[in-house]
């Protein structure tokens, strides 16, 4: 029973880590893709040090 509980805890911890790692908010978009990336957000695309910023 304790092995099953340990396995369930490991699987849950891995799911939480994957959710944090694959967070789309941390997505880095280059300057070339910046206008398309900001297009649907009604924002003005600017590029600072090679990183896209969508300024509302």
Curated annotation (Swiss-Prot):
UniProt-annotated location(s): Secreted
Signal peptide: 1-28
Cross-referenced Pfam families: Toxin_6
Residues in coiled coil: none
InterPro entries cross-referenced by the UniProt entry: Scorpion_toxin-like_sf, Toxin_alpha-KTx_8/9
Gene Ontology terms for molecular function: ion channel inhibitor activity; potassium channel regulator activity; toxin activity
Biological function: Blocks small conductance calcium-activated potassium channels (KCNN, SK). Weakly inhibits the Kv7.1/KCNQ1 channel (10 uM of the toxin inhibits currents by 23.3%). Low toxicity by intracerebroventricular injection into mice.
Notes on the domains: Has the structural arrangement of an alpha-helix connected to a beta-sheet by disulfide bonds (CSalpha/beta).
Protein family (similarity comment): Belongs to the short scorpion toxin superfamily. Potassium channel inhibitor family. Alpha-KTx 09 subfamily.
Name under which the protein is recorded: Potassium channel toxin alpha-KTx 9.1
Organism: Olivierus martensii
Lineage of producing organism: Eukaryota, Metazoa, Ecdysozoa, Arthropoda, Chelicerata
């Amino acid at each position: 029973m304790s092995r099953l509980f340990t396995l369930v805890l490991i699987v849950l911890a891995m799911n939480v880590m994957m959710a944090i790692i694959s967070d789309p908010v941390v997505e880095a978009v280059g300057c070339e893709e910046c206008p398309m990336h900001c297009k649907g957000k009604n924002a003005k695309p600017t590029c600072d040090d090679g990183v896209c910023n969508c300024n509302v």
